[in-house]
């Protein structure tokens, strides 16, 4: 049975991860850590104040859903301590991923870092890769709850990168230039992501995590959309990563390879 620690355990995602781990018959919730929530209860455990509790609990795997700055500090601790890591925090840059790859290349521990653990969202990206070479234009709209700090989301950036890579691999030319010649309001056309894919962010109460990818071609459009209505939608992917990370040397980015797609 794998002993699992959860960092960021007092947040909404962290508490959901604790519940999922506690309910899994092959996993044991060994420790919950979250300094701002220290002393609170989650799944019958008292939330610990500091990362040192991870070693004391002899956790095999840690799931980190804290904030990006904390993850940057925590990853070297996991790598040096030989604790396998599953990270779902957004806001990590390509440079952060490169640093993590170096850390875990020289570690006895492995890591999985994913922008989105919802299996439907991963499938959306795969469907977008299939569509990208056959359509003339594309834009991405991501919609999240009003407490999300980063914009655009990691999932939307990853989607744009996947679309750009699929077009390049197929030998398709670049996306058409933005036809806008008069910007009445600054930012109205969103941000330019990888491969020139336009990214638009929406933040509203009542939302969880949603993404809509709109492809356009002469006389037609194709819309691919995924909606997470509940944080439980992420748990199958999180648990898959927890169970798989011990057998995935070094750093794995995304859960696509864990799903075999």
What are these regions (language model features)?
Residues 29, 47, 85-86, 110-111:
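Hydrophobic beta-strand scaffold residues
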Residues 68-69, 91-92, 116-117, 204:
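Short glycine-rich anion-binding loops that position phosphate/pyrophosphate groups of nucleotides
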Residues 1-4:
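Extreme N-terminal starter segment of soluble prokaryotic enzymes
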Residues 75-76, 80, 89-111, 122, ...:
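Rossmann-fold NAD(P)-binding glycine/threonine-rich loop
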Residues 7, 65-66, 88-89, 114, ...:
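Structural motif
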